[in-house]
Structures are given as C-alpha cells and as structure tokens.
C-alpha cells in the first residue's frame, strides 16, 4: 500500500514531551484489533499492553484510550482513502470482476437507546404521565401533615414538574423544527425496523459487493430506514470506484426495496449501469392489475383482459380509458369501482419502467445469486467481527467507523483467498 496517498495525521501534542505516535502504526493497530473483534478504545488500550502480536505489530506502542479514539476521529478522510486504496490493490490482484455487483442494506444499532428516542406522541404521553403525578402529589400534600412525608412528596413534586417542563420544551422545539422524531444521544440516528427485534434506534448501512470474490467495493451509511433512494446513489459510487466506462456496463442487482421510478430512470440514463431490480407486487390483491393490460406502442393503445381497447384520453393526464366498454363489461367488478370505468395511467417514464421489468425477468437466474452474494458479507461483519452496533455517534463518525469494519472484512476475505506469503510478495 502506498502510505503517501493516505495522508494520516499525527496526534497534536504539546511543544514538550515525547513525539507523537506513528499514524501508520496506529492504523495497523486498528485493523488488527477490528480483525479480532476488539473494538472499543479502552479494550484496545489493554491489548496494547499485554498482546504479544499487537506489541510486535506496533513496535511496542502503548497509547492510552483517548489517543486511540482521537486517531479515528482525526483521520476520517485518510481512513476513507485507505478503503479506496484497498480496492485499488484488490483490483490490481484481479480479485474484482467489475461485471456484476449486488447492493443491499442492513440496520446497525446506534449508540442511542430506544428510551432516548422520542416522538411527538411519546412526548404527549410523558407530559400527561407527569401531569397526573403532579396532581397526585399535590393531593397527598393537602392530606399529609407529617413533616418527613411532606418533604419526600415535595421532592417528588419538584422532579415531576422539572420533567414535565423538559418534555414540553423538547416538544415545542421539535414542532418548531418540523420534525416528528428525535434521538437525544445521537441526533442523527433514527428508529428503524430491525430483523426479528421489532424496532430499534439504528443506521442503515449500505454495501455493494462484487460478484467475483465477494469484496465490498462501496459502502455508505444512511439515516433513512428505507432502501429507496439508495439504488442510483450506490450504483453510481460503485461505477466511479471501479472506473467503469459506458462501453462496459456494470450489472447491479438489488431487491424490491430499491424499486423506485426516479432511481430506475437515473440508472437508465447512466449508460454505465445495468440495473436488475426485483419487481414489487402491485398494491391490492383483488382484481386486474396494470400489468394485466397489454400496451401496443405502434397504435398507442392498451388491451384489457376482456379484449377491449383503451385509447388515450384527450387531456393533460395521459390516461387510457374506454367508458362504453367498461359499462357493459362482465368483469367490471373485478376491475374497477369507478362509474367512468377503468383508467390506465401511462407517464413519460413508463417505457423505462417496462424495460426494467423485462430486464428483471430476463436476468432472473442471475438475480437469484443476489442474496448469497450480498448477505454473506453482512453475516461475516456481524457474526465474526462483532459489528452489530456502532460505538461512535453522529452520521459523520459512524461512516468513519463503518469504513474500518469494511476494510477489516475485505482484508479477512483476501487472506482466505491468498496465503500470507503470497500476499506479502
């Protein structure tokens, strides 16, 4: 690895005293510890004093936990550059196919408990709860003449009033900012659906994995619980990272959670990207769906399941209808409840959406490899490397922490492919 391109910075020190630690040695220390599931700065500090392998790797460095934590905080750009340098090396070793990648996301818990995540509705309940307590304490004071009991009740009353005021102020602030949810410890984290656990306060970690050797090429962290809006963003980053040209389109596999018209249109406009996205089921389970109506591009008409022709209505909205045929159609109850009959909307991007459906069907066998391709790295990150929650706070810092985990996974993957002597050579 070319250390000069990483641009790690030394820890800032006073004019007197020992010189700062070598940042490359600090970086090696982080990779070793993450590789072995040691993540917190205090645990790393302990290992630096007793772990023989780590003492050898770092030339006997024994930094304290604050220095260790500050290195990660002060070298965000350098850590991201290191990830990109890893990918460049893996590409040189021909470990990246540059033909097919799979994109998926997983929820990683934030350093913010569910208790410290509030919504307007939750605040209303808390305010009501403390209001009831205040009334109860006032009632007890009016009925109690014993000094010791009175002092205890007054103390509880004071705390209840303070809590009520705190929640009312927080509610007013949230309403002023126009937000319905707020995390009190990590302000960027959000409550999200977590597999098998209902909901939790978390971040949405996105990875794109190359099909050849399961190397994570691109990674990102989002605050949006849904994967929608992430398709083109991740596909574009991956194409840029791998220097894909328009002559060699990159096939991107993604599940139905990424199906979004705007993203599919952007992918279609970018000739470097060939998006194969699972098609979600249409809303509603009863009656005929839009996909049951066949469009004839030459005649600009739709043919319904009953064989009737729907022509374009002369108006601003591109609707295709046939009120007369619908009125006497025996399948009307299965098709629509509208008195005017069934209307099919065809917007300007309908052709792209139809080609996306066709592309998915034509590449279904390739799409089936998506799950084992992209889920495998997430399993390794969580089960083997212990990456089930973030230790840092705010989006900027958790992105940095995520890069370290992804580099560790990629290193672990490469060491399973090559023997160490081969890799050193």
Model-derived features with residue positions:
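Basic, short loop/linker segments at the boundary and entry of helix-turn-helix/winged-helix-like folds
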Residues: 1-31, 344, 348, 352
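Helical catalytic core of nucleic-acid polymerases
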Residues: 2-5, 15, 22-23, 48-58, ...
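Anion-binding and metal-coordination hotspots
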Residues: 19, 30, 37-50, 61-425
């Amino acid at each position: 690895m070319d250390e000069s391109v990483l641009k790690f910075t030394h820890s800032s020190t006073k004019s007197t005293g020992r010189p700062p630690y070598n940042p490359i040695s600090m970086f090696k220390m982080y990779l070793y510890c993450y590789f072995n599931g040691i993540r917190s700065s205090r645990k790393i500090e302990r290992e630096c004093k007793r772990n023989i392998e780590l003492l050898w790797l770092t030339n006997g460095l024994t930094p304290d936990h604050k220095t260790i934590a500050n290195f990660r905080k002060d070298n965000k750009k350098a850590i991201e550059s290191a990830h990109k340098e890893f990918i460049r090396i893996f590409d040189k070793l021909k470990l990246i196919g540059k033909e097919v990648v799979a994109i998926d996301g997983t929820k990683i818990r934030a350093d913010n408990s569910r208790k410290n995540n509030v919504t307007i509705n939750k605040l209303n309940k808390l305010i009501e709860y403390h209001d009831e307590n205040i009334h109860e304490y006032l009632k007890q004071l009016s009925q109690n003449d014993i000094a010791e009991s009175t002092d205890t009740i007054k103390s509880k009353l004071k705390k209840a009033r303070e809590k009520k005021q705190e929640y009312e102020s927080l509610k007013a602030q949230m309403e002023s900012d126009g937000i319905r949810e707020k995390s009190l410890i990590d302000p960027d984290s959000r409550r999200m659906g977590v597999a098998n656990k209902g909901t939790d306060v978390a971040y949405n970690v996105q990875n794109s994995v190359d099909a050849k050797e399961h190397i994570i090429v691109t990674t990102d962290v989002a605050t949006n619980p849904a994967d929608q809006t992430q398709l083109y963003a991740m596909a574009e980053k991956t194409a840029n990272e791998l220097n894909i040209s328009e002559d060699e389109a990159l096939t991107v596999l993604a599940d139905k959670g990424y199906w979004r018209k705007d993203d599919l249109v952007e992918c279609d406009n970018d000739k470097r990207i060939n998006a194969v996205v699972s098609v979600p089921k249409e809303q509603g389970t009863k009656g005929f769906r839009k996909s049951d109506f066949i469009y004839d591009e030459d005649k600009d008409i739709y043919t319904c399941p009953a064989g009737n022709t729907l022509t374009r209505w002369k108006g601003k909205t591109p609707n295709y209808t046939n009120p007369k045929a619908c009125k006497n159609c025996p399948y009307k109850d299965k098709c629509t409840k509208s008195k005017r009959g069934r209307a099919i909307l065809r917007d300007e991007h309908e052709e792209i959406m139809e080609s996306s459906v066709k592309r998915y069907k034509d590449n279904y066998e390739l799409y089936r490899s998506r799950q084992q391709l992209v889920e495998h790295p997430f399993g390794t990150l969580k089960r083997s490397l212990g990456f089930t929650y973030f230790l840092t706070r705010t989006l900027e810092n958790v992105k940095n922490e995520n890069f370290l985990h992804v580099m560790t996974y990629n290193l672990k993957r490469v060491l399973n492919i090559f023997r160490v002597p081969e890799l050193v050579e």
